Design a protein with these regions (language model features):
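Structured alpha-helical segments in the cores of large, soluble enzyme domains
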Residues: 246-259
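Acidic/aromatic-lined carbohydrate-recognition and catalytic surfaces
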Residues: 1-228, 260, 267-290
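N- or domain-start disorder-to-order transition segments that initiate the globular core
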Residues: 229, 239-243
Length: 290
């Protein structure tokens, strides 16, 4: 029976191994259930875990599956339970999120496009594109100042780069001059020349126009953004939990922990942000009680 919880924020500086150390103390306090912040893979360095980027695995910064199982076993041996916070409403987006990256790369044809609450037809001139309000100025000004460039990795991968942010390219749109870099590191200089000068700027603009996303001035977010966010936080994108397939794919790991009797209870963060909160809770309860 749940009578008293004690909440802990788990992160790289306070991982599961450290949590285990205080189980005897919590037991002596009379705590019935330990309540943990989200444990699914979040952005590297996240101190809270609510910016999940991969719901299919445990956050490697907080520990291993064996350490989670050991913590649950120690709690259960002490007559205590484990409650976990989960975040079905949104995910952190960016290069760390392989599902979002796949959507930016392949557009609405991506198998993960159904995960995200994107209105692909919101703008007639931008139909089929995700609007990313990430620029500090209008795109033309950004190009004029040379702030948008190519990012060529040591392995030969090519992305668009805007200061610290990078964006994927649809492989079908990458011209031969840039494709060569993947096979010949010596072609890097030629690739860099490809974007120099006025002609290079025009080529870069044409390349960007062929992507499944639009880089826009951040001030345009309120009127132009076409994906649901967590309030007005641009890098937390809403998920389509009313879609049964999305529910299944994003909850498989958590439900595995429940089925294996590692997790004894779930707390749902921001459930009111979902399209159908009641429907979600009914579905979740049914899955948990299987």
């Amino acid at each position: 029976m749940l009578t008293a919880t004690y909440r802990l924020q788990v992160h790289k500086d306070f991982p599961l191994a450290r949590v285990r150390e205080i189980v005897p103390y919590l037991n002596a306090l009379g705590i019935s259930h330990l309540y943990l912040s989200p444990l699914l893979a979040a952005r590297p360095g996240s101190t809270h875990g609510y910016d999940v980027v991969d719901p299919t695995r445990l956050n490697p910064e907080v520990g291993t599956e064996d350490e989670l199982r050991a913590l649950a076993a120690e709690l259960h041996d002490a007559g205590m339970g484990l409650i976990l916070d989960i975040v079905p409403n949104h995910m952190g987006i960016g290069p760390e999120n392989p599902f979002w990256e796949n959507v930016l790369t392949h557009g609405r044809q991506s198998r993960y496009a159904r995960w995200f609450d994107i209105d692909w037809d919101a703008h007639p001139k931008r139909r089929g594109k995700v609007v990313l309000p990430a620029l500090g100025d209008e795109l033309a000004a950004v190009l004029d100042k040379g702030e948008l460039r190519l990012d060529i990795s040591e392995s030969g991968g090519v992305r668009l780069k805007y200061y610290d942010d990078t964006y994927p390219l649809d492989p079908a749109t990458v011209p031969p001059e840039l494709q060569l870099v993947q096979f010949d590191p010596g072609a890097k200089q030629a690739a860099e020349e490809w974007v120099r000068g006025e002609e290079g700027k025009a080529r870069l603009r044409a390349l960007l126009d062929r992507q499944h996303y639009v880089l826009a001035f951040w001030r345009c977010a309120p009127s132009d953004i076409n994906y649901r966010r967590f309030f007005d936080v641009n890098d937390l994108a809403g998920l389509r939990m009313a879609d049964p397939a999305v529910f299944d794919e994003t909850h498989a790991k958590v439900l595995e922990w429940v089925s294996d009797e590692i997790i004894d209870g779930l707390r749902i963060d921001h459930v009111d942000g979902l399209r159908d909160p009641l429907g979600y809770l009914v579905r979740l309860r049914a899955e948990v009680q299987r």
